[in-house]
Amino acid sequence: IHIHDLDAYGLTYNCLTFDILKAFPYSDFAGLSSVKAILGVFDFLKELFERVGNEQSGGMALANFDNDFASIFTTLNVDYKNNKEIFCAAIRDLIIWCNNTHTRMGQTSYYISFNIGLAENDFARFLAFTLIDEFYKAGELIYKPNIIFKVAKGINRNPQDRNYDLLLKALECTGKKMIPTYLLCDCEMDKDTSPELLSVMGCRTRVVTDRFGKSGAIGRSNIDNITINLPRLAFETVKDHPDLPSDELFEKCKEKWLSIADTVTEILLDRFHKTCMQDIDLFPTLKQYDLLCGNINITGLSEVFKHGTLSIGFIGLSEMLDVIFGGKFWDNEKIYNAALNMLSFMRGYTDKQAEKYNLNFSLLATSGELISGRFVEIDQTKFKSDIFKKGFYTNSFHVEVDSKIPAWEKIEKEGKFHAYCNGGCISYVELAEAPIGNPQGLDELVEIAINAGVHYLGFNYPKDVCAECGTSGTFDVCPVCNSSHITRIRRVSGYLEIQDYFTSGKKHEAKTRKAN
């Protein structure tokens, strides 16, 4: 297993979608000119990210940046029509800040996600458009923050919808910079929840249902998560039972997962209770601005954190099934059904734990990040397999990155998996190059994904940037200035990153990828 953010064990929670409107400090900006109010609000937002980012261990999100900040500025009597240049400059500065500020834990940038797309009025539409446009126009090495576009029928999904133009603008930006990614509000698992309540982190964390009545992500957290190494369980099962047929090996592997999951549950509960026992003074920003769905000043931490999720994650479903059955789930119906069976089995367990402990246990399709290579390095010291040669395990339930199956088929194969992973998941389409100028083509894939059951969708492609002249494309030597000083931007686990800073497992995965 891998205990994520171990250095924060029992000290703080993982991630949070801000309840930004509940206690917004309007009085701090009362009486200011429009220009000062605009600059002041965006400076406040940066300060908020910086402060909260050091009170917790993971990402931060705004569920409805466009609507919420249109409401904030309207309350402050700020008119966007006469201040467009100031808004553009302030949003541009915010984007640059997200890339250049490295004060999280004293050394790294912040994991920030803006969810947009549901804009209800012209002001909100302007903010959504400007965020996308300024990100699009920013330098090729600007790859933060993560922007998530919420796709919903009657709002932006179809040509007759009021915000369809914003969807096309978002897809145009994705074709150049891989951002935004897309939260598909009409998919099977999300269609019964109001789109305004839905929000995701760039790392794929999903917080929706709540045993205590606070449906949706706003003001709620993932408290902690632990990932189980599925290939390791398969290797151990085959070693323990070398003569069993594959169907029986599969059942034995599930039994082994169950025993590990019981231990994981104990650790999650221990961490949750220790976090709830912390002094609320360790969370001064949450106290001051009441960003959680409950008021910790009144109820204490446990009554607020109980609305959060405790997630059991998994990695390497594909490799696990390969070890057991000797094949790939995307081209074998029997193995594909076993994949569905395994996901249903794991989800059934987390649902039972939620009932047993009256807490929001969930199943998380883990992003690889630190563990895709780490697990391989550990396992290959104990077992022998050709699977280790590639140097990493495949993220969550994904089709392996060198499968070369068509994009529509990858989407449809993975789509059925999403509904089981109520703690978060994402499907990616791997493209050979940036689909610049083809938003309609990406829109068709978005539509296929919605109908296939995909909850969260991203588009990946290799993006190389010349560090000398800024030319972008796919190359080892710049075609403009002949420089070999190339910066490679890739997405492997959720957020875009520079490939030079990848862990070994992520570097191996990036090199192995083939286009769908």
Model features per residue range: what roles?
Residues 1-306, 327-328, 332-492, 497-499, ...:
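Conserved catalytic cores of very large enzyme subunits
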Residues 67, 310-323, 344:
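Contiguous, well-ordered alpha-helical segments that form the cores/surfaces of helical PPI scaffolds
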Residues 502-509, 513-515:
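Short, intrinsically disordered terminal segments enriched in charged and Pro/Gly residues
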